[in-house]
Amino acid sequence: MVNDSISDMLTRLRNAICAQHKVVQVPLTNINKNILKVLQKEGYIKNFEILFERKSGYLLVSLKYNSLNQDKPCLSVLKKISRPGLRMYVRTKKIPKVLGGTGIAIISTSKGVMTGSIARNLGIGGEILCYIW
């Protein structure tokens, strides 16, 4: 059993990108599903689907690569920020701009999981889960 499902998912995505896989399988949890929805909406992954096998389920994620250079993935860096031993919470005005706005910060708020820019526009803070660029 994995204690931190977000770190596990990010590591699986990172390893699949390094191995240039087209799809990767990650455990099915609500937080993983919500993070993947944000990544799909922002254009970092193609899509994902929920599959069930016996008692447990998993998410099958289709990775996205650049159209000009098929070897270069759309996801280059996935960095976990908040971890079980040290949670990182921010107010609205302290939400960081990742790489000057090139990347995204994924934040868990009272309104759900969203990007840092959307949370800033809504005027709500939350827990910084990870940075993506």
Swiss-Prot record:
Q: Does the keyword Ribosomal protein apply?
A: yes
Q: What is the name listed in the Swiss-Prot or TrEMBL entry for this protein? A: Small ribosomal subunit protein uS8c
Q: Where in the cell is it found?
A: Plastid, Chloroplast
GO cellular component assignments: chloroplast; ribonucleoprotein complex; ribosome
Recite the UniProt keywords alphabetically.
Answer: Chloroplast, Plastid, Ribonucleoprotein, Ribosomal protein, RNA-binding, rRNA-binding
Q: Which Gene3D superfamilies does the UniProt entry name for this protein?
A: 3.30.1370.30, 3.30.1490.10
The UniProt subunit note reads as follows: Part of the 30S ribosomal subunit.
Q: Which family does it belong to?
A: Belongs to the universal ribosomal protein uS8 family.
Q: Does the keyword Mitochondrion apply?
A: no
Query: According to the lineage, what is the superkingdom?
Result: Eukaryota
Which PROSITE patterns does the UniProt entry name for this protein? RIBOSOMAL_S8
Extract one GO molecular function annotation from the record: structural constituent of ribosome
Q: Name one GO biological process term.
A: translation
Q: What's one Pfam family here?
A: Ribosomal_S8
What does this protein's UniProt record list under function?
One of the primary rRNA binding proteins, it binds directly to 16S rRNA central domain where it helps coordinate assembly of the platform of the 30S subunit.
Concerning InterPro entries, the annotation shows:
Ribosomal_uS8 (IPR000630), Ribosomal_uS8_CS (IPR047863), Ribosomal_uS8_sf (IPR035987)
